[in-house]
Curated annotation (Swiss-Prot):
GO BP terms, alphabetized: dTDP biosynthetic process; dTTP biosynthetic process; dUDP biosynthetic process
Superkingdom of this protein's organism: Bacteria
Protein's UniProt name: Thymidylate kinase
Keywords annotated in UniProt: ATP-binding, Kinase, Nucleotide biosynthesis, Nucleotide-binding, Transferase
Phylogenetic classification of the source organism: Bacteria, Pseudomonadati, Pseudomonadota, Gammaproteobacteria, Legionellales
GN (gene name): tmk
Organism for this UniProt entry: Coxiella burnetii (strain RSA 493 / Nine Mile phase I)
EC number(s) recorded for this UniProt protein: 2.7.4.9
Keyword Kinase (UniProt): yes
C-alpha cells in the first residue's frame, strides 16, 4: 500500500452489530442523507465487496461437512478485507467519495475475538498489516438484546454458517462490541435499536451530522497516514 499520501479524502462510516440489529436499515437512512446532500459515496460490505472477496464470503458463510477452524475463519476474513480495502475503500476515499461499510475490522475483534476466543494480539497483528492505521471516521454500533436480534434473523428463513451459532456465541460477540465502543468513544456511537424506529433514525442522523458539516470541499487535501 502507498504510505502517507496527501489525498482528497472522503469520509468513512462503518456499521457494526450482531445479526438482526438493523444495520441495513441504518445504512439506507445514511444513504438517503448523502443523496439529499449530493455527496458521492460507495457502499461495501464485509466479508465481501469485490468479486474475490465475495467468493471468500461464500466460503465463510456456507455450511460444510468440514468444520472451519477459528484461525481459518480469521485469516479468510482478513484476506477478503485486504481485497476490499485495496479495490473499494482506498480508491473511493482517494476520489473524495464517502465509504459506507456494512461491517469492518471491528467485526473481527467481536466475532473471531469475542465469539471464537482468538487472542486479541493475533487480530491486532493482522489489522496492523492489512490496514496500517486506516480506521472509520465514525462507527455506528447498532445494538439490541441478543434474543431480539436472533428472533429477527429467524424470521428471514435459512441461516448461514455464522447466523446458525448459538445464543452464548452472540452474547460474547455483543459484549465485545460494547467493550470496543467503550475503548474508543470518539469513534463509536452506540445506537439502541430495540425502540421506536423514529428514535433510532434520529440518533443516527445526530451521529452523522458532524461529518456532514465537516465534509471537505471538492479538492481539499487531507493527510492520511498508513495508506
Amino acid at each position: 500500500m502507498e504510505k502517507n499520501m496527501g489525498i482528497e479524502r472522503g469520509r468513512f462510516i462503518s456499521f457494526e452489530g450482531i445479526e438482526g440489529v438493523g444495520k441495513t436499515t441504518a445504512l439506507n437512512w445514511v444513504r438517503e442523507q448523502l443523496d439529499a446532500a449530493r455527496i458521492p459515496y460507495v457502499v461495501t460490505r464485509e466479508p465481501g465487496g469485490t468479486p474475490i472477496a465475495e467468493a471468500i464470503r461464500d466460503v465463510l458463510l456456507s455450511h460444510s461437512d468440514e468444520m472451519m477452524c477459528p484461525d481459518t475463519e480469521l485469516l479468510l476474513m482478513f484476506a477478503g478485507r485486504a481485497q476490499n480495502i485495496a479495490h473499494v475503500v482506498l480508491p473511493a476515499l482517494r476520489r473524495g467519495q464517502w465509504v459506507l461499510s456494512d461491517r469492518f475490522t471491528d467485526a473481527s475483534f467481536a466475532y473471531q475475538g469475542g465469539g471464537r476466543g482468538i487472542p486479541v494480539k493475533h487480530i491486532e497483528e493482522l489489522a496492523g498489516w492489512v490496514l496500517g492505521n486506516l480506521k472509520p471516521d465514525l462507527t455506528l454500533l447498532l445494538d439490541a438484546p441478543v434474543s431480539v436480534g436472533l428472533c429477527r434473523v429467524k424470521s428471514r428463513g435459512a441461516k448461514d454458517r455464522i447466523e446458525a451459532e448459538g445464543l452464548e456465541f452472540f452474547k460474547r460477540v455483543r459484549e465485545c462490541y460494547l467493550a470496543l465502543a467503550n475503548q474508543e468513544p470518539a469513534r463509536f456511537r452506540v445506537i439502541h435499536t430495540d425502540q421506536d424506529l423514529s428514535n433510532v433514525k434520529n440518533q443516527i442522523m445526530k451521529a452523522i451530522k458532524p461529518l456532514l458539516t465537516a465534509s471537505p470541499l471538492p479538492g481539499e487535501k487531507t493527510e492520511i497516514e498508513g495508506l
